[in-house]
Design a protein with these regions (language model features):
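Active-site neighborhoods and metal-handling regions in enzymes and metal-associated proteins
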Residues: 1-595
């Protein structure tokens, strides 16, 4: 460990050697992605931190990592001995990077360097405004250095390029030409002629195309320019891309030439500053005056979040088939561990993936399995390692958070299960987290209600006993796309986006006790119309997840009748849907679990 700490200390020293007052290293890629290819894992290369969300700032006298509540424990462990300080976000006392930089320097001018390929236009504008307020015009200099770390990172990976998979209307429920026609109509309504798209999930949805350039996410690294006449897809290895009607393929590296050649065709251009990287924006500005660019949230974000009939059918199928694999896994785990078989967290994770991979249409996991026993489950995004993986023992709690990518849908399920004797505290936490999940599941609410307005339903049982969790309660899920998508969310942070029929969102409260245990229950919900009255339209949720809830350690007096009835009814449905999909011994086991 000391040797690894020295590696990261050396890398921080190399970054300081670039000669800037501050260097910002962002945890994203040129497309604003949450998950990205190894080439852009710059924060991990420089610091050793492997969490999905984190930004690094290196000054001549300080190195700091900014990350949120999901990763505090992990960051403390991985940063130990590196000299890098943890800066906590999504807490009341947070000081984000722009404000921290604005208060850190005593002398001017301040030279701040960043990789403009991995900083959004919106982020750079916020940074510019904040530093101007602190140091005044001329008191600072923002320096865009594309691929800033390449001179230091000798074996930096190349940009990947995987085979292209075009999907047809039978799979997606809507043809590519119809999606493009809709987008062009949207642009007209916004006073624009064209749109430049950078977000990989939006491009994948719009073009009905998938790939595997990024682990767990079926994307092709690319840009897309949609004009009134054409859709130009900028992608690597153009010669290997199968033809698709209505799509012109161009090389990923000739974006500047294409913008110049098609300037007149584009007219007024719409871009989303939250995902467009700053360096690409500068290229666009070479050919478009500021008055010829319209900023706004991409209309694709909301449109793809509202699933069509075919997509909803696919999700239902995915959760049933994945549920059968998960039940088979839980049967194997319980019988193996209680039977004295040596099973590690890694082996359990591999077993889950092996069972899921037997499903027709499987394209990979939708994220890295979280296979966590005991105290390891207190890290919400814990990932076990093949070497020295902890042994799962026949006592306490085990947590599995797992999902799959299928051509007909994407899944994400968490189950915490007892493997033997559990403490009173474990049983209380288990029951109260389940109580919160059920209370949100049973919600009926008026149309126009945002996720932040119903988040407290999942937290109320925890708050009542002075418990809480730091992450959001729910995130959107894409259709054979990313397991995390917006615009909706269920979390305490303000998000005005209403929940709408057709949205598919997770419901995953939890409790995490460092050094002891972690509990999370997660089902995925389909928002639907419940009915109408003189007070308007009301909405509710349908549960898509199909995996039983273990009731053996519930403290039933902590649940009311409606909650107990829900558990019984849910488990009955799970058994009915899965019994004929399971091996006889697994079906027999599940029947007992669902009583």
């Amino acid at each position: 460990m000391a040797q690894m700490d020295n590696i990261f200390a050396d890398r921080i020293a190399q970054i300081r050697g670039l000669g800037y007052d501050a260097v910002i290293i962002s945890g994203t890629d040129p497309h604003g992605s949450e998950y990205f290819a190894p080439r852009w894992k710059q924060v991990e290369w420089a610091s050793g931190f492997t969490g999905e969300a984190g930004d690094l700032v290196v000054t001549q006298d300080h190195a700091g990592l900014w990350t949120d509540t999901r990763f505090f424990i992990q960051a403390n462990q991985q940063l130990a001995g590196t000299g890098i300080e943890l800066h906590k976000t999504r807490v009341p006392e947070e000081v984000l990077i722009p404000r921290w930089l604005a208060g850190h320097f005593q002398t001017k001018p301040v030279r701040v360097a960043f990789d403009g390929l991995c900083q959004s236009v919106g982020a750079v504008r916020e940074l510019d405004d904040t530093l101007r307020g602190a140091y005044g015009i001329g008191g600072y200099d923002l320096i865009d250095r594309p691929d800033l770390l390449s001179s230091l990172w000798a074996d930096r990976p190349e940009i990947p390029h995987s085979p292209v998979e075009w999907l047809d209307e039978k799979t997606t429920g809507e043809a590519r030409k119809d999606k493009l026609a809709w987008l062009r109509s949207e642009m007209k309504q916004r006073g624009c002629d064209s749109m430049f798209l950078t977000s990989l999930d939006e491009i994948a949805w719009l073009l009905n195309v998938r790939g595997s350039d990024i682990a767990y996410n079926p994307y092709i690294i690319s840009f897309l320019l949609v004009t009134p006449l054409n859709a130009i897809w900028f992608v690597r290895n153009v010669s290997e891309v199968p033809d698709a009607p209505g799509i012109i393929c161009a090389d990923y590296g000739v974006l500047e030439d294409a913008l110049e050649d098609r300037r007149e065709e584009c007219g007024r251009l719409f871009i989303d500053p939250s995902t467009l990287n700053y360096h690409t924006y500068k290229l666009i500005r070479k050919f478009f005056a500021e008055s010829e660019i319209v900023f706004g949230e991409s209309p694709v974000v909301l449109r793809k979040a509202i699933k069509n009939k075919k997509e909803i059918e696919g999700f239902r199928r995915a959760f049933i088939e994945d549920g059968a694999a998960l039940e088979t896994f839980l049967y194997w785990l319980e019988t193996s561990v209680k039977g004295g078989t040596h099973v590690t967290e890694w082996e359990a994770s591999e077993k889950m993936t092996s069972l899921r991979s037997q499903i027709e249409g499987f394209r990979g996991n939708s994220f890295e399995n979280i296979s966590a026993y005991g105290a390891n489950a207190a890290l919400p995004h814990y990932c076990t390692q093949r070497e020295n993986s902890p042994v799962i023992k026949p006592r306490g709690l085990y947590l599995i958070d797992t999902g799959g990518q299928f051509t007909f849908g994407t899944t994400d399920t968490t189950r915490t299960v007892p493997l033997g004797r559990c403490s009173r505290l474990e049983r209380e936490d288990y029951t109260l987290v389940l109580k919160g999940m059920i209370d949100l599941t049973l919600a009926v609410f008026p149309g126009g209600t945002a996720g932040c307005q119903i988040d407290a339903l999942a937290r109320r049982p925890l708050w009542a006993t002075r418990r809480n969790f730091g992450h959001g309660t729910g995130h959107g899920i894409g259709f054979y796309l990313g397991v995390h998508e917006g615009p909706q969310s269920i979390r305490q942070n303000f998000n005005p986006q209403p929940m709408l029929p057709g949205m598919i969102t997770s419901n995953e409260p939890g409790i995490y006790r460092e050094g002891k245990h972690g509990v999370r229950h997660e089902n995925v919900l389909l928002c639907r119309e419940e009915g109408k009255s003189e007070f308007g339209t009301f909405l509710s949720f349908e549960t898509l997840t199909c995996c039983h809830i273990d009731t053996s350690i519930l403290i039933k007096k902590l649940l009311n009748k409606a909650e107990l009835d829900w558990v019984k009814a849910y488990n009955r449905v799970v058994y009915r849907l899965l019994k004929n999909r399971l091996a006889p011994e697994v079906a027999k086991w599940l029947k007992k679990k669902c009583r």
